[in-house]
Amino acid sequence: MKKYLLTFVLFFETIILIAQSKPAYVLYNAKGKKVTYKKMIKQLIEKDVVLFGEFHNNPISHWLELSVAKDLAGKKAITFGAEMFEADNQQALNDYLAGKITAKGLDSAVRLWSNYKTDYAPLVNFAKEKNAPFIATNIPRRYAALVSKKGFEALDTIPALAKTW
């Protein structure tokens, strides 16, 4: 019995030690040197623009994005932007942020990505809570498809009003 108990304890201690040595993320500066989250935030506070590159289907990057946003918003004015929103959906996004439509209304009005609720909604709702602007930064799909099929010259064929998106 003692043998089984000792094996059980050693097994779980090993798992705990292994789990502690595998962080969910590691941060590096521009020179490839590891930096702490605290140091990164201290440096980002001094910047006018912070661009956050992320993998669309990586929940850790979205969690980190929200954490950075919360820490920066506590220190300075912040404006958000995301390519998951297309520019022609800006008004619906503004209406949601202003409380004129519900989350369900936003879902009906905008072409949301499949991971919106889990990965992007927390950031959008944080912007809403802070009354911070949120910019729809992506080109509308129909124009992206047009360029993909016919090249950038195809944009010359669309009306000037359409180009305001």
Predicted segments with their positions:
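Bacterial Sec-dependent N-terminal signal peptides
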Residues: 1-23
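Short, basic, glycine/proline-bearing loop/turn elements
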Residues: 21-26, 48-55, 104-111
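N-terminal, post-signal-peptide region of Sec/Tat-exported proteins
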Residues: 45-78, 84
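Solvent-exposed, acidic/flexible segments
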Residues: 33, 37, 58-65, 90, ...
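Post-signal peptide N-terminal segment of secreted/secretory-pathway proteins
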Residues: 57, 65, 69, 91-101
